[in-house]
Amino acid sequence: MKIIFTVFCFLIFNFSAEAKSLNGYLTAKKDTNYIENYYNDLIIRLYSGEKTHSLDLNDLNGPYHLKYLPNGYFNLGTGVNFRSFGLSLATKVPVFQNSEFKHGETKRFGIQSYIYSSKFTVDLLTSFLKGYYLVNSSTHLSSYTKDKDYQRPDISSANIGVSVNYIFNNSRFSYRAAFSDTERQKKSAGSLIAGGSVISYRTKADSAIVPREIDPEYFMKSRDISKSGVLAFNANIGYAYSFVFLKNGIFTLSYVLGTGIQDNTFGSEVDSEINRWRFRMNHSGRLGFGYRFNRYYLRIGVIRSTQYTNLKYNDLGIGNGTNFMQVSLGKRFSLRK
C-alpha cells in the first residue's frame, strides 16, 4: 500500500509541475464585472493563525465520544504576494500558547498549505505530532479536575495528504478573493467544485488509546487498540458561494463531500473480522470573512477537514480532522506605471 500511495502522490505532483508551464490551463479568463485582479500589485500582510489535528473516538453503540487534541499555539507572521510569487514566515507566540501543565507538551513538525489558482484549489498536508490531551477530561475521568487534563505524551500521529479540486465557475467566482486577497469579488457568485484526494492518517500509542478508567460499558470491543491507520482515495464534489455586502465586504462558505475506498488497519496485526477495504466518507468546509478599506483589508479564514473510519464490529468510530484558522491584516501597493 505504501508503494501505491507513493506512486499516486508522485503522479499528482508531476501533473501539477507540468501544469504550471501551461499558463492557459491554469489561468481562467475573468469576468471583470465580478472579479478584480490584483496580479500586478504588491500585497504585504501581518497574520496570526493556528493549525492542529484532532482525534475523535466515537462509540457507535451510543452517543458517547472522546476527543484528543495536541497542545496548540498561535503563530505570528508576515507575508508578501506579487504576481505568482508568495512567501510567508511565522513564529510561535509563547504568550498565546496553552498551558503545558494543563494540556502537556506537544512536539510537532509539518507543512499545511492551501494553494488557490484561478481554476484549482490544492490542499497539501504533512503533519507529525507527538503528545495529546483528552478534552474535558474531568467529565470522563473522576480522578481528574478542570485544572489538569488527562495527558498522553505517548500518542503520536503522522498525517499526509493532497486534495485537488476544480472550480467550474472560475470566471465569476474567486477563492483568492476570500482566502489569499490577490483578487476582489465585486458581485456575489458561487461555483460547483469537484476533484479528488488521497489521504493517509496514522496514529499509535504505547498503550490503549481509550483510557483504562473509562466506564467499561463503552468501547467494549475495541478498548485495547493502540494503533490505527487510514489510507483513503476519494472523489470529491461540493459547492462554494461568496456573498458580497456593503460593496467591500465578502462572506464565503464552501462544503465539499468526498467518498471512496479506504484501507483501515488497527494494531500490529489485522483481525480477520475487520474489513480493511471499504467505502467511507470525508468532508471539508471553508469559511471566510473579509472587508476592505481602500487598500487595506482584514480577513478571517477557517478550514476544517475530517476523514472517518470504523471497525467492522460497529463499535469504534475514528474521525481524523485537520483544522486551520488565520486572521490577516494587510495592505496593497500598486506597482503599475
Per-region residue spans from a language model:
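Outer-membrane beta-barrel "beta-signal"
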Residues: 161-164, 321-337
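Outer-envelope beta-barrel architecture signal
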Residues: 38-44, 74, 83-87, 118-122, ...
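Surface-exposed strand-loop-strand hairpins of Gram-negative outer-membrane beta-barrel proteins
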Residues: 51-75, 86-104
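Short loop/turn motifs that connect adjacent beta-strands in outer-membrane beta-barrel proteins
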Residues: 20-23, 27-40, 119, 169-190, ...
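Transmembrane beta-strands of outer-membrane beta-barrel pores
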Residues: 48-54, 82-86, 91-97, 117-119, ...
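Membrane-embedded beta-strand positions in outer-membrane beta-barrel channels/transporters
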Residues: 43, 75-77, 110, 161-163, ...
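Extracellular/periplasm-exposed beta-strand and loop segments of Gram-negative cell-envelope proteins
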Residues: 67, 135-139, 146-161, 203-214, ...
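Membrane-embedded beta-strand positions of outer-membrane beta-barrel proteins
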Residues: 44-46, 78, 89, 113, ...
